[in-house]
């Protein structure tokens, strides 16, 4: 039995407060590159067509919709999140895309997924594992929910190496991004973002965390000069 922590509740409330502008700000602040990152992540899941997929921290369903697009009519997606408002936006997007029947939404924390063992072919989480209060438990839950031979795919922000680009990006990430985000949204969500990324483990350490949780053959590769890292594990 898992009880929501104060941090769980705070994260859910924070994202609910920015839900109406979340997609707009994502496109603006990433210059649209986030769509490519999601395409690459979904391409790592199995099977290539059809299948059952779990999307943890589904939010406004960008990842769930990309799964439906790549995997075709035979695929089904279960999206879980703590923010009802974010999922409401996601449901509206799925309806507009004609995917209401293929994507189901459930309110649940990543630390306690309401599914039986081996229920899915693959599980993924995009830019959400940072926000899981008990990260190790969340990874174990994803592994538990995936069948043997399935994939666990994590897409997450990372800190670029200490190059000129890395220094430039860090300035943008820590100083510019929160200001732009603050103009279009209330609250501290875009101040929280750089803080949470800087506190996140380095890629080799997080890959080891995935192995400890139950993933085998874990790989990780940087995308867009290391702004984001794509992690893939086999259950």
Residues covered by each model-derived region:
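Core SAM-dependent methyltransferase catalytic element
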Residues: 213-235
């Amino acid at each position: 039995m898992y009880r929501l922590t104060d941090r769980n509740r705070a994260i859910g409330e924070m994202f609910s407060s920015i839900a109406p502008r979340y997609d707009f700000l994502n496109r603006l602040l990433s210059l649209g590159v986030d769509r490519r990152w999601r395409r690459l992540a979904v391409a790592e899941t199995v099977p290539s067509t059809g299948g059952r997929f779990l999307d943890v921290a589904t939010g406004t369903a960008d990842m769930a919709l990309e799964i439906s697009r790549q995997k075709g009519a035979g695929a089904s997606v279960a999206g879980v999140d703590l923010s009802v408002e974010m999922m409401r936006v996601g449901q509206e997007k799925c309806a507009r895309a004609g995917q209401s029947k293929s994507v189901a939404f459930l309110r649940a924390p990543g630390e306690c997924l309401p599914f039986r063992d081996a229920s899915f072919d693959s599980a993924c989480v995009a830019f959400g594992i940072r926000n899981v209060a008990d990260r190790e438990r969340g990874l174990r839950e994803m592994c538990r929910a995936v069948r043997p031979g399935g994939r666990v795919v994590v897409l997450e922000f990372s800190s670029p190496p200490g190059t000129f680009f890395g220094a430039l990006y860090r300035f943008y990430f820590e100083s510019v991004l929160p200001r732009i985000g603050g103009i279009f949204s209330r609250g501290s969500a875009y101040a929280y973002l750089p803080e949470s990324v800087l506190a996140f483990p380095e890629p080799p350490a997080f890959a080891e965390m995935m192995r400890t949780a139950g993933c085998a053959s874990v790989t990780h590769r940087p995308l867009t000069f290391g702004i984001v890292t794509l992690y893939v594990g086999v259950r």
